[in-house]
A protein has these predicted regions:
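Structured alpha/beta or helical-core interaction and ligand-binding surfaces enriched in interleaved
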Residues: 24
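Interdomain "pre-motor" coupling segment immediately N-terminal to P-loop NTPase/helicase cores
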Residues: 1-21
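Walker A/P-loop NTP-binding motif of AAA+ ATPase domains
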Residues: 27-176
Length: 176
C-alpha cells in the first residue's frame, strides 16, 4: 500500500486489520479517525463553497521512536483503500538552491494527481522552527511546505519524534 522512491526500503506488506486505540495519545479513537477521513471529501466540498478552494485533512503523529506512527498511517491507508506516497528527507532535500522547494511542490503535486495519502516521515527535517534558521534556504523550504500544506486537497500525514522543534505555524495547520 505504499509507493517508495529512490530505492528506499520497502515497508512491510502485512497491515493490521484493527488498531488498538489505547496506544494512541488522543481522545479520538482509530475508528473515528477513519470515519472522519472517509467524510473528508464532503468536508472539502463544503469548504470549497465557503472559501473557493479544496481543503484536505492534515495530521501530525508524534512520539518517541517505535510507537507506531508510520504503522498507524499504513493502517489508515488500508482502511481507506488508498495508497501512501511516502517521502523521506533523502527524497526531498537537495544541495542545490531552490531544488528542495521544487521537490516539496512535486511531492504534493504527485499525491494530488494520483489521489494518494501523502506521508512525510520525520517531518521535523522539513519544517523546523524558522526562528532558529541560520540560512535563507532553511526558511524558504519551510515556507514552501506550509504553502503546499494549505493548498493540498488530500490527506497529509506527517510523523516526528521531535514535535518541540517544529515551526509554530506548521503546528497550527494540522487538524489532528
Amino acid at each position: 500500500n505504499s509507493l517508495l522512491i529512490n530505492g528506499a526500503n520497502k515497508m512491510r506488506c502485512n497491515v493490521a486489520t484493527s488498531y488498538d486505540s489505547s496506544v494512541l495519545n488522543t481522545s479520538i479513537g482509530a475508528e473515528s479517525i477513519v470515519k472522519m477521513l472517509k467524510n473528508a471529501k464532503s468536508f472539502a466540498k463544503k469548504n470549497r463553497m465557503v472559501s473557493g478552494m479544496d481543503t484536505g485533512v492534515r495530521m501530525l503523529f508524534y512520539g518517541v521512536s517505535g510507537t507506531g506512527k508510520t504503522e498507524f498511517a499504513r493502517y489508515l491507508s488500508e482502511m481507506l483503500g488508498k495508497k501512501i506516497l511516502l517521502k523521506r528527507v533523502s527524497d526531498i532535500m537537495s544541495k542545490w538552491v531552490g531544488e528542495t522547494e521544487g521537490n516539496i511542490a512535486k511531492a504534493f503535486a504527485e499525491a494530488t494527481e494520483r489521489d494518494m495519502i501523502l506521508l512525510f516521515d520525520e517531518a521535523d527535517s522539513f519544517f523546523a522552527d524558522r526562528n532558529n534558521a541560520e540560512r535563507s534556504w532553511e526558511r524558504t523550504s519551510v515556507n514552501e511546505f506550509l504553502t503546499q500544506m494549505e493548498e493540498f486537497p488530500g490527506i497529509l500525514i506527517c510523523t516526528t519524534n521531535l514535535k518541540h522543534i517544529l515551526d509554530k505555524a506548521s503546528l497550527r495547520r494540522f487538524h489532528i
